[in-house]
């Protein structure tokens, strides 16, 4: 897209993660081998409510001055290029709006340029 290597990420507006993504030009996308139980907790508990990173015994590290996890197998460091909110009038399948957005808390879509890729051997 736009002659760049990009990723697309989606975050609901109430997610604590959104505050971190919005506060910086860059963010990380971290991918893991295993850690199913830990990742399930990270996806269901808010960092506003408890220190979930500590609870799962993950460790923050920085790559290109961007926070990520030491436990990640693959990390993309990306720079935001574009952000917009999913628009209900753009759904072709309108059942998605009804089923997935009863609170009308539409995801924010971020398009970001891949700056670096790190693979842990």
Where are these regions (language model features)?
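Active-site-proximal mixed secondary-structure blocks
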Residues: 1-121
């Amino acid at each position: 897209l736009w002659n760049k290597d990009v990723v697309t990420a989606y975050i609901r507006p109430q997610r604590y993660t959104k505050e971190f993504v919005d506060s910086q030009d860059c963010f990380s996308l971290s991918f893991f081998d295993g850690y199913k139980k830990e990742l399930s907790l990270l996806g269901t508990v808010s960092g506003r409510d408890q220190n979930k990173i500590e609870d799962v015994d993950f460790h923050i590290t920085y790559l290109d001055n961007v926070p990520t996890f030491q436990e990640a197998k693959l990390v993309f460091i990306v720079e935001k290029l574009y952000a917009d909110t999913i628009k209900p009038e753009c759904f072709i399948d309108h059942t998605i709006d009804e089923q997935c957005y009863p609170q009308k808390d539409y995801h924010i879509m971020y398009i970001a340029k891949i700056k670096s890729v790190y693979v842990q051997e």
